């Protein structure tokens, strides 16, 4: 037993438990009490341990580590104040130590009080330490969130919004057109977004029409008239994209006479064409190569004007080979061929190919006006399908405009109105007039029908003018009638005002008299108008006669008018004089009655 404990035991036994003694016991002080050694020997071990237990219950062990000496007597090390020990006394009653954070394996566990602590681990992946067997579930902060069991990234936010078309009784067609609903509209918008971003390749649909030069060689049928190799036939195939099997398997009818391929190369890159057009051009180039061999064998020339052709090039309307008119589109028969005739001499081909003029002439002639004297007239095609009016393409730059013909076997008219036209120059190229392909212009335009149309239109205009005049007259009459009715309505009193039959009779008489007066004045105005009109007509007739006669007649007319004016004046005065005695008679009749 230490000396301090013995001293404290002595002080307790003696009853001197003062504050100074406690301070001396806590912080140390001078030894005032000398303890006899015999007293320590006589004390029982149990008596010494009892105050030790009381001290342990009063002072908590938090922050205090007991170190046992060799003899087994504990040596306390006080590291906290009394206030902290009092506040932690409640926690000591709970046999649970809560540790926040990672606890490494092998860390010293608090095994005091005989129970194992429970570890509340908040971090993911950590193990819950303890031997209690109940696994404590923690909050996983790193896991992705979820709404009603659905991951947060997969939740459709539109489902939380109150859409107007989802309300009961709403008509979906008021919000989505063309048969869309909410889901298909979202899919459509997503597809358009991908197309705009360039993530999706737009396929060439089968509804787009194309006109391709299917056969690159120019052909002439045996029945056509050949003048020193100047008639060349393009074979143009009209159909739809996407049917490469049909187009490649289409047999081409070869004629006896073949010509070099088309004049110009197109600048279309092969990436812009579909696979069907590429396969088509490959077959066309094969045919061109075979026909070139025949052309060289027949004419003995080593090189034709242009035998070079780009591998992916295709002749399409609107590029270099332009056709003046294509009468309609055939959709029923996709493999129908339209044969286009163009004239070209071999010398013109050699001279003109070296430097072709620009693509469009600056003043391309309009197709709806009659042609100038240096252009061939537009052709007539009787066998073309009348589905769509012709689009009207400008003529090609390096050659005279080709013309469509109904049948190749039909004869050609000689000349343009039986006259020869001079060649019209453009740049360095002179286009000669076509002698055989153009029918005469008067045969194409029926002038009598046009004049009939103009005469008919003039008659219709006159008729409409007359109708408008009659309508105006009827309107004026209706206005006068309505005015008269309003006037009568203004003068007419209500039926309750009529007290006697005399008043009603008098009112009717007054109304009739007013109507008669109005009618007389209107007739007078009409007579005056007619007289003025007649005088105008007379003066117009008089102006055509001689001056002396006109003067004489005008004097007679003036005297006649003066005489008439005097006469009318006299008649008016007589009427006024006759109407004045009437009130006097009424007054004289009224006096005897009184």
Curated annotation (Swiss-Prot):
Q: Which processes are annotated in GO (biological process)?
A: mRNA processing
Record's compositionally biased regions (Low complexity): 274-285
User: Pfam families, alphabetically?
Assistant: Fip1 (PF05182)
Single GO cellular component annotation?
Answer: mRNA cleavage and polyadenylation specificity factor complex
Sorted alphabetically, the keyword list is: mRNA processing, Nucleus, Phosphoprotein, RNA-binding
Q: Which residues carry this modification: Phosphothreonine?
A: 494
- Illness the protein is tied to: A chromosomal aberration involving FIP1L1 is found in some cases of hypereosinophilic syndrome. Interstitial chromosomal deletion del(4)(q12q12) causes the fusion of FIP1L1 and PDGFRA (FIP1L1-PDGFRA).
General function of this protein: Component of the cleavage and polyadenylation specificity factor (CPSF) complex that plays a key role in pre-mRNA 3'-end formation, recognizing the AAUAAA signal sequence and interacting with poly(A) polymerase and other factors to bring about cleavage and poly(A) addition. FIP1L1 contributes to poly(A) site recognition and stimulates poly(A) addition. Binds to U-rich RNA sequence elements surrounding the poly(A) site. May act to tether poly(A) polymerase to the CPSF complex.
| Stated name of the protein | Pre-mRNA 3'-end-processing factor FIP1
């Amino acid at each position: 037993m230490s000396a301090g404990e013995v001293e404290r035991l002595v002080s307790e036994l003696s009853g001197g438990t003062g504050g100074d003694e406690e301070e001396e016991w806590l912080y140390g002080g001078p030894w005032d009490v000398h303890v006899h050694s015999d007293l320590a020997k006589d004390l029982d071990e149990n008596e010494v341990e009892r105050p030790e237990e009381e001290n342990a219950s009063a002072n908590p062990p938090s922050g205090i580590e007991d170190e046992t000496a060799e003899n087994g007597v504990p040596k306390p090390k006080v590291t906290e104040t009394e206030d902290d020990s009092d506040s932690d006394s409640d926690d000591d009653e709970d046999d649970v130590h809560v540790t926040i954070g990672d606890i490494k394996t092998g860390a010293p566990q608090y095994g005091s009080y005989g129970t194992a602590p429970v570890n509340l681990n908040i971090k993911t992946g950590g193990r819950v330490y303890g031997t209690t067997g109940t696994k404590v579930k923690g909050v996983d902060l790193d896991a992705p969130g979820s709404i009603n069991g659905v991951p947060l990234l997969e939740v459709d936010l539109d489902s939380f919004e109150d859409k107007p078309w989802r309300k009961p009784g709403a008509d979906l067609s008021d919000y989505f057109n063309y048969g869309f609903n909410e889901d298909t509209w979202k899919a459509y918008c997503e597809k358009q977004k991908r197309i705009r971003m360039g993530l999706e390749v737009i396929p060439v649909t089968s509804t787009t029409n194309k006109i391709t030069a299917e056969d690159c060689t120019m052909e002439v049928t045996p029945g056509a008239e050949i003048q020193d190799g100047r008639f060349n036939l393009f074979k143009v195939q009209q159909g739809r994209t996407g049917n490469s099997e049909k187009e490649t398997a289409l047999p081409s009818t070869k004629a006896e006479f073949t010509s070099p391929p088309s004049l110009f190369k197109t600048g279309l890159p092969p990436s812009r064409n579909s696979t069907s057009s590429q396969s088509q051009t490959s077959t066309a180039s094969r045919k061109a190569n075979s026909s070139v061999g025949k052309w060289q064998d027949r004419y003995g020339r080593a090189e034709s004007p242009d035998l070079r052709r780009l591998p992916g090039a295709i002749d399409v309307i609107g590029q270099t080979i332009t056709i003046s008119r294509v009468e309609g589109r055939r959709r029923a028969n996709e493999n129908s061929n339209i044969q286009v005739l163009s004239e070209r001499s071999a010398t013109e081909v050699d001279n003109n190919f070296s430097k072709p003029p620009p693509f469009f002439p600056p003043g391309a002639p309009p197709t709806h006006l009659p042609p100038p004297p240096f252009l061939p007239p537009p052709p007539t095609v009787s066998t073309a399908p009348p589905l769509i009016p012709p689009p009207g393409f400008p003529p090609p730059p390096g050659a005279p405009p080709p013309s469509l013909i109904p049948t190749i076997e039909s004869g050609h008219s000689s000349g343009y109105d039986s006259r020869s036209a001079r060649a019209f120059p453009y740049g360095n190229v002179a286009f000669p007039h076509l002698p055989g392909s153009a029918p005469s212009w008067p045969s194409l335009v029926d002038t009598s029908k046009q004049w009939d149309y103009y005469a008919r239109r003039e008659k219709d205009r006159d008729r409409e003018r007359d109708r408008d005049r009659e309508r105006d007259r009827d309107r004026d009459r209706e206005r006068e009638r309505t005015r008269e009715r309003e006037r009568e309505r203004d003068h007419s009193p209500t039926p309750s005002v009529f007290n006697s039959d005399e008043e009603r009779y008098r009112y009717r008489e007054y109304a009739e008299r007013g109507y008669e007066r109005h009618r007389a004045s209107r007739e007078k105005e009409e007579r005056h108008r007619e007289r003025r009109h007649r005088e105008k007509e007379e003066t117009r007739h008089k102006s055509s006669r001689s001056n002396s006669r006109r003067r004489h007649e005008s004097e007679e007319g003036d005297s006649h008018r003066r005489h008439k004016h005097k006469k009318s004046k006299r008649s008016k005065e007589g009427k006024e004089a006759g109407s004045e005695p009437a009130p006097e008679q009424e007054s004289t009749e009224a006096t005897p009655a009184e």
